[in-house]
Amino acid sequence: MIKPEESRFAAGTIFFLLFPTPDRRPGLTFRYGEHLSMRIAFAGTPDFAAAALKALIAAGHTITLVLTQPDRPSGRGMKLKPSPVKAVALEHGLIVLTPLALRGPKAGDEGEAALKALEESESYVFVVAAYGLILPERALNAARGVGEDGSIKSINIHASLLPRWRGAAPINRAIEAMDKETGVDLMKMDIGLDTGDVICSAPVAITEDHDAAQLTEELTQVGARLIVTALEHPETLTHRPQLENGVTYAKKLLKTESPIVWTQDARQVAARIRAFSPFPGSTTVRNGETVKIWFAKAVEGSGQPGEILAVGDAVVIACGTGAVACTRLQRAGKPAMDAKPFAQSLQLKIGEVLV
């Protein structure tokens, strides 16, 4: 039996210490010395989810159905572009459905057809990763179920250690809050917002070298490994309720959060810059021109908030307390640059004040 609290190890690694017996249920094929292959339905949209889908395919599982969000306009030409999950699904010849919604007035016939397809897919488990659409209870209960008690019908791959950072932007909010650790949880889904029982966890340390893009990539790989490892022996999985203490919510990122508040403590300013890289970005204004800062670390220094204290390998800017060393910056309409060529292009001078 796998106990979730025994499955946490450092560096995003999870170990399952068990000796399984063959599962002879219809739809499952046990192969001694290899993985247990079964029928899996999948829902997800971004790269975080696409990596998990690739890993499940590589592990030999049969993907019965893929749900992902509709194609979106992208690039300067605003041409419709499929989601990363759809691209993977099409590459492997999988059935892909892209309903606008699965419940509510927007669901319509397309949403109903997707739910019916999910129910008729004869899947043993429904794996969800950053899908982006609200799933009705009907979808959560569509699969047959795995686990010791057979009750795990849908599994969510969530990029935090629950109950901390339930919601839409757990990676960004963890960096913004200066957390020292985050990770990936596999969660038995229920109708609440990331409130389901935890199946297993893989913690990952957060350092000052992580921005949101880098941490997302790391957690993406951890999540892909975690779901494959868990489903090697699905009949042994257990689950436990989330702790009642320590619940926090990772609210959706907004473009209105971009402006840097230089009166804040330098550690907070630097954390927000890294948390909002690449989206929504962190901006300041110099002589009426908007400047985006992509990466920064807190350093010692004092001056008027927003004042440039040094220019070189980093542009050092004073905050309410301390200063931040900015090493990657960008002018509007221009590519991002390292600090030194950026400062030269704008002829930045010590003593200037950014707002």
Segments predicted by a language model, with ranges:
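Hydrophobic alpha-helical signal peptides and transmembrane signal-/tail-anchor segments
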Residues: 14-20
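Hydrophobic residues within membrane-embedded alpha helices
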Residues: 4-7, 20
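One-carbon transfer enzymes
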Residues: 8, 12-13, 27-278, 331-333, ...
